[in-house]
Amino acid sequence: NSKFEIRNSKLVLEEHNLKPITLKSKEGLALINGTQFMSAYGVYCLIKANQLLAKTDFIASISIDAFDCRLEPFHHLLHDIRPHKGQIATAKKILENLADSEIAKQHKVQVQDQYAFRCIPQVHGASKDAIEHINKIFTTEINAVTDNPNVFAEEDLILSGGNFHGQTLAIHLDFLAIALAELGSISERRTYQLISGQRNLPAFLVSNP
C-alpha cells in the first residue's frame, strides 16, 4: 500500500545534500550504447516466466484430476526413453502432485486421454528447456561488456567492435515468446475439454449454463 509520487530529481538531490553525477569521457556513451535496456527487459520477462513455470504443472495436475485422466502417460519409463530434462521433470511433478488423489486411482473407462492432457510433459517440458536455455543467455549478457569502443588497459588497446548489437537477445526473446505461447495454448485446450460437457461434467461446469 505504499504511495509513490513523481518528483523533480534536482530537488530530491538537494534535500539529501547530493550532487548530480557528472559523466566523464565515454561514460555517457557506455550508458546508452549497449544492450542494457534489452537485458533489463529480458530479465524482467524471465522472472515472470519462471514464476509462471512454477504454477503450470500444479494447474495442469488439477485439470488432470478434474477430467478424470489416466496417469500412464506420466510413467517414468516413457520419459526415460526420451530423456529431455524438462519432460522428465514435468512428468515427475505431475505424479507427485497426484500421488494422494483418490480420483487418479479410480478405474478409467477411456483407453487414452486427449493430447492436451497426455502430452503435458512434452509441451511443458519443451518450454521449460527453452526457458532454461534463455536464462543462460541472459545471465551471460548481464555479466558482459556491450558498449563501444572497448578499452583494454592492460593491453594498451582501444578496440571498436559490435558488442552493442542486440541480436542474440532479440532472437532469444522471440524464443521466450514461443515457449510461453505454447504453455498458454495447451492450457486453453484443457480448459475447452473441461467445459465441453464431457466425462459427466456439466457444460461450462455449471448446472444451468
What is the role of each PLM region?
Residues 28-34, 147-155, 194-200:
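Active-site-adjacent bridging/hinge elements
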Residues 64-185:
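Accessory "access/gating" subregions that flank catalytic or transport cores
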Residues 13-15, 28, 34-35, 123-124, ...:
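Short secondary-structure boundary micro-motifs
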Residues 1, 5-95:
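Mobile "lid/hinge" segments at catalytic clefts and subdomain interfaces of large enzymes
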Residues 45, 49-52, 120-123, 127, ...:
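Charged, low-complexity, helix-prone segments enriched in Lys/Glu/Asp/Gln
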Residues 21-28, 57-64, 101-106, 141-145, ...:
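Short, functional N-terminal and low-complexity linear motifs
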Residues 14-23, 153-160, 199-207:
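Glycine/charged-rich beta-loop-alpha catalytic/anionic-binding loops adjacent to active sites
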Residues 167-209:
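C-terminal catalytic subdomain
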